[in-house]
A protein has these predicted regions:
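Transition-metal
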Residues: 1-178, 241-282, 316, 404
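A short hydrophobic beta-strand segment most commonly corresponding to one strand
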Residues: 128, 149-153, 220-245, 379-403
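Intrinsically disordered, low-complexity linker/loop segments enriched in Gly/Pro
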Residues: 154-212
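Loop-centered beta-sheet repeat module
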Residues: 189-249
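Short beta-strand segments in beta-sandwich/barrel cores
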Residues: 326-327, 342-348
Length: 404
């Protein structure tokens, strides 16, 4: 069978819901936190040179930019289609290009000609360096798009918080540009001490943070669900983390060739109003927000919360279907989803939450729901008398259901 056409057949087979394969991504500069359900023997299955697998990407049409050894389709989600005799796969990216608005909705296709977000788990034993994502204007200088992102810390994946469950956000009010410039100039001299000019917040399971472009942040070691714009632009502004040296190349990572070595260009990437915000927690922290009154939802057999809701570039919800309940959930946009807990039925599919996954094994825990299926309503049945179904749902930009 031709690859073209598999996507349409898969959409038909799933009645508007596509089953996706697990998409694992290694990072050479990180130590895995081992909370994303990969088999203990498989965290280094790609070889020591590639580093440990500490990420799983969801609903991704964005290839991982992971150095010269990056695998051919690394970071790209694939769809599984059962043709009656075997399971075939086609990239979600190719399916979006083939099916266009039929899959992601005409609104997103007409505006973006792509699925413009993805989500991931990142799962590190230690914290990441204080770093920054460029806005659209700065990213355009290297042919990329800017990158807003958001964090949510799922209780199901955080039975331990790792070595440093605190995240540095922004720059302490009163800090001058000259002080930050000196940190950047000192990048190659050991610890440039940039987090001395920041503040850290304790991370709590079941909560999240909003991270717009231009905001310095050093993510803590909780296992994190991270919806984000489909871009991979960043620069590391901290030179030493956990006694590990960060290569200078990563400081200039998002800088055009002609500006490399110009520290003022690095300062220009920083959104100073965002970073010096005296109300950082009030403006960036996200506690879950019920989509409607909780008692009303419980009476219908479910609870749904917005968990990422401060960006127009994407949004995310946590849906809980109570034990034994059968519900039909409607959304105005296409979305990807990942199971966190429980088992049951979703449309024509069996859905379940695996306890352990081998590298290369297929699962029934990740799906992509077309706009048409989402707006008509997805029927979910919880087949357990005790265990709730919990899933995380990630949406594209301009979600009509989200009031910012």
């Amino acid at each position: 069978m031709e690859k073209k056409g598999i996507a349409a057949k898969a959409l038909e087979q799933g009645k508007g819901i596509l089953r996706l394969t697990p998409t694992w991504v290694p990072r050479s500069f990180c130590v895995p936190g081992r909370r994303i359900k990969l088999h203990p023997d498989d965290y280094y299955v790609l070889g020591g040179e590639r580093g440990g697998i500490d990420e799983r990407w969801f609903a991704s049409t964005t290839p991982a930019k992971n150095g010269p050894l990056t695998g051919e389709n690394e970071g790209l989600s694939a769809i599984v289609f059962n043709n009656g005799t075997e399971e075939e796969q086609v990239l979600l990216k190719d399916a979006v290009e083939e099916l266009k608005g039929e899959l992601i909705g005409d609104r997103l296709w007409d505006e973006h000609k792509s699925w413009p977000m993805y989500s991931k788990f990142f799962d590190n034993m230690g914290q990441l360096p204080h770093h920054i994502h460029h806005n659209d204007e700065k990213a355009a200088l290297i042919g990329q798009m800017g990158k807003p992102e958001a964090y949510y810390f799922p209780p199901q994946l955080n039975n331990h918080g790792g070595d440093f469950p605190y995240t540095f956000m922004g720059i302490s009010p009163g800090t001058t540009k000259e002080e930050i410039r000196e940190c950047l100039v000192n990048f190659t001299k050991g610890d440039n001490k940039i987090t001395s000019y920041s503040q850290a917040y304790q991370l709590d399971p079941g909560t999240g943070w909003d991270v717009p472009p231009g905001l310095l942040h050093a993510p803590g070691s909780m296992c994190t669900y991270e919806p984000q714009k489909a871009s991979d632009v960043f620069a590391m502004y901290q030179s030493l983390v956990n006694e590990a040296i960060i290569p200078e190349a990563l400081l200039w990572n998002g800088t055009p060739e002609e500006s490399k070595g110009d520290f003022d260009a690095l300062l220009d990437v920083i959104d100073w109003d965002l970073n010096l915000d005296p109300n950082m927690m009030q403006n960036r922290f996200m506690a879950p927000k019920p989509v409607k009154p909780i008692e009303e939802m419980k009476a219908e057999g479910y609870i749904e919360n917005w968990i990422c809701y401060k960006s127009d570039a994407f949004s995310a919800k946590e849906l809980t279907v109570l034990p034994g309940a059968s519900v039909t959930i409607k959304d105005s946009g296409a979305y990807g989803m990942i199971m966190m807990q429980g088992h049951g039925k979703m449309g024509v599919w069996d859905i379940e939450t695996p306890a352990l996954i081998r590298y290369g094994q297929l699962t029934n825990d990740e799906f992509f729901i077309s706009e048409k299926a989402a707006s008509e309503g997805v029927k979910i049945v919880n087949l357990s008398a005790n265990d709730p179904i919990v899933m995380l749902k990630h949406f594209g930009p301009g979600n009509p259901d989200l009031v910012l």
